[in-house]
Amino acid sequence: PGISSAASDVYKRQEQMKIQNLSEEFLAEIVTPISLYLDQTFPKRNQPYFICFTGGQGSGKTTLSFFIQKVLNETVKRPAMGFSIDDIYKSQEERRSLAKEIHPLCYVRGVPGTHDIKMGLNLINELSNASPETKTKIPAFCKPEDRHYPSEEWPIYKGKPDFIFFDAWCGGAKPLPEENWLPPLNQLEKEEDPEGIWSKWSNQELSKDYQTMFSLFDLLLMIKVPNMDFVYESRWIQEQTLAKTVKDKDLKNKIMTKEEVYRFVMHYERLTNYILKELPKLSDIVLARDGNFKFSISKTP
């Protein structure tokens, strides 16, 4: 009864969160079993467990992470918290200098090389060494303004969690083999990176601190979407949802058009294609998501 009441409470909140295409079936067949699995598989210990949710843009990683945290915190009474790779971007200044030094596309946030992985590692370290009274600031990034919120506005987590959830579109990914490097594969690469300088730089960055962070995962859960077209469409739905939730007029003006969203997703296409092919083998749990936004569990440990 506890789990189902938590699930129905979560279901009532979906309207308030403006999350589309969420069903009670998703909560009963996906959220609840995974929450119970985590509780039963990972007994209490001194160090938090580090769980990664990976999958393309708009696949539902953050939503799934949020609801599992809610069930663990409120029903199973296992403290859980989460953060996103989208909250640990490098600053505009850092990306600007990369753009001057390496390639103009390095300024655009999102691909490996544009995140401050050390910030993420420091956060994990702080939470792992926290006492019950420790207050840890969780980084928060404002996408429409392309900057971190001032640190005094960052959310605070009190105590030491049993679980740290991390959602990242490229979580767990290995670098692409460079010997079979494909020529430019979309309009963005053809026009702005015909020599592959930027895409190879990002791939090399993925082989550095990212692998250090990914090696800490106690469990990797992947949401596998059907294809790249789905990623484009999902990311556009996400932007429309953002447009409904943003009240500030200046921020509303920074919401992307459909063309801008598609151009933006082109930055991720090379690595996303590789992830869709290779990452299911490396993941502990794989959720398949079809074109109608329905989830099913396709791989379990």
Task: Show which residues each predicted segment covers.
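Phosphate-binding/switch loop-helix module in NTP-utilizing enzymes
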Residues: 125-173
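N-terminal pre-Walker A segment at the start of P-loop NTPase domains
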Residues: 18-39
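Hydrophobic positions on the alpha1 helix immediately C-terminal to the Walker A/P-loop
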Residues: 64, 68
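Single conserved hydrophobic/aromatic residue that forms the stacking wall/gate
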Residues: 1-7, 11
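Conserved lysine of the Walker
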Residues: 61
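Walker A (P-loop) phosphate-binding loop of P-loop NTPases
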Residues: 58
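Conserved nucleotide-sensing/catalytic segment adjacent to the nucleotide-binding pocket
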Residues: 81, 88-141
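Conserved NTP phosphate-binding and transfer environment spanning the P-loop NTPase/kinase superfamily
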Residues: 170-301
